[in-house]
Amino acid sequence: MVMTLYKLDASPPARAVMMVIEALKIPDVEYIDVNLLEGSHLSEEFTKMNPQHTVPLLKDDDFLVWDSHAIAGYLVSKYGADDSLYPTDPKKRAIVDQRLHFDSGILFPALRGSLEPVIFWGETAFRPECLEKVRKGYDFAEKFLTSTWMAGEEFTVADICCVASISTMNDIIVPIDENTYPKLSAWLERCSQLDVYKKKNAPGNDLCKDLVASKLS
């Protein structure tokens, strides 16, 4: 059966999964757009599959899984030719997992907290406390980047998930100052040169940027 990804291109977590699919060269994936602005994610059909009514949602045969980090690990474990994107070595995987939890626990909440009031609640400026959380995320990421990539010398799903969030934060909410965050700035530039980023992250990031710009005063 064909694998199906329910997604929204403007969504950073959905873009992360699309980058993983691209990196793994998984063929025959059906993409179904879910319009959050119109409430498509709240339909009975969708909430039966995902009670949390979030995107992305992956359907692989009769298996359903949501949350971009869980999907990323599943895809690499099942379809990866090797474990380079999600190492099986316990110590290496622990670092990757920590960075994934950093994205889900620090980066994405700061991103969502900034964008949700503007996109869905009619606010016309970012909340100052949310901007501070974005900067705190940058502070942590700068300290984590002691190697070429987010979790060491190998490009992993940690980079994919974190860059989906950080690129959006940089382009829309708080630009990354290369003098304050030289390592983070250099890492983001490296990520932006990758084919998976250009194909599956940049276009959706532009859509998100345009959407937010239309809402801000």
Curated annotation (Swiss-Prot):
Family recorded in the similarity comment: Belongs to the GST superfamily. Theta family.
UniProt EC number: 2.5.1.18
Reactions catalysed: RX + glutathione = an S-substituted glutathione + a halide anion + H(+)
Keyword terms, alphabetized: Transferase
A Gene Ontology BP annotation from the UniProt entry: glutathione metabolic process
Purpose of the protein: Conjugation of reduced glutathione to a wide number of exogenous and endogenous hydrophobic electrophiles.
Residues the record lists as binding glutathione: 11, 53-55, 67-69
GO terms for MF: glutathione transferase activity
Summary of subunit composition and partner proteins: Homodimer.
Source organism phylogeny: Eukaryota, Metazoa, Ecdysozoa, Arthropoda, Hexapoda
Protein name listed in UniProt: Glutathione S-transferase 1
Pfam families xref list: GST_C, GST_N_3
Domain named GST N-terminal: residues: 1-83
Top EC group: transferase
Chain ranges of the GST C-terminal domain: 89-211
